[in-house]
């Protein structure tokens, strides 16, 4: 559903505000790097194999207002699926964690997400990007696991929510 809501934001910005935006989703876990690598692979497979039946099932079962409004906006479901497959293709997704080989190169992408030429729409991260990182077009944060609650994790979660729970940062 996060991908569909992200697409809804993109479509509304285009239709209502006449602006091209690139909403970014952060998929975050505190578990091991192998777990995030597998989640990334599963996500890519899900996007590549996305079908009309799957989208229709989400549209029919969802009670989220954004999904219901998106359903009304989608005129051609095949074009909509093509847009998702293009927007979230393999080279538009980034995996980052402490053990990644090309971490410095990936950090350059992360620090230029607002650049229209930067293709990244989804980030898969393991216990990284916790402090001092702010991106105007990061609208959705998907927590992929439940960790034990500590005072530090509660503060970290509040900071994370603060990054994702923002108003549309552009004038309209």
Can you name each region flagged by the protein language model?
Residues 148-171:
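Conserved SF2 helicase motif VI
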Residues 123-139, 160-164:
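SF2 helicase motor core recognition
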Residues 39-47, 139-145, 156-161:
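Short secondary-structure boundary/capping segments
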Residues 35-36, 133-134, 169:
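Short helix/loop capping segments that flank catalytic or ligand/cofactor-binding pockets
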Residues 5-125, 150-153:
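Conserved C-terminal RecA-like helicase domain
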Residues 31-33, 129-131, 146-150, 165-166:
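Conserved nucleotide-binding/hydrolysis micro-motifs of P-loop NTPases
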Residues 21-23, 136-140, 155, 172:
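Short glycine-/polar-rich loops that comprise or flank the Walker A/P-loop
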């Amino acid at each position: 559903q996060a991908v569909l809501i992200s697409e809804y934001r993109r479509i509304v910005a285009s239709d209502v505000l006449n602006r091209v935006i690139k909403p970014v989703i952060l998929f975050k876990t505190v578990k091991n790097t192998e777990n995030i690598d597998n989640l990334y692979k599963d996500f890519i497979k899900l996007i590549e194999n996305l079908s009309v039946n799957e989208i229709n099932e989400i549209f029919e079962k969802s009670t989220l207002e954004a999904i219901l409004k998106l359903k009304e906006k989608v005129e051609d479901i095949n074009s909509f699926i093509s847009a998702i497959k293009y927007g979230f293709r393999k080279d538009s997704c980034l995996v980052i964690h402490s053990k990644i080989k090309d971490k410095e190169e990936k950090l350059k992408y992360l620090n230029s997400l607002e650049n229209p030429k930067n293709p990244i729409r989804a980030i898969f991260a393991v216990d990284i990007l916790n402090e001092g990182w702010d991106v105007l077009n990061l609208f959705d944060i998907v927590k992929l696991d439940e960790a034990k609650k500590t005072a530090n994790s509660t503060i970290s979660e509040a900071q994370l929510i603060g990054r994702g729970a923002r108003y549309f940062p552009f004038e309209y």
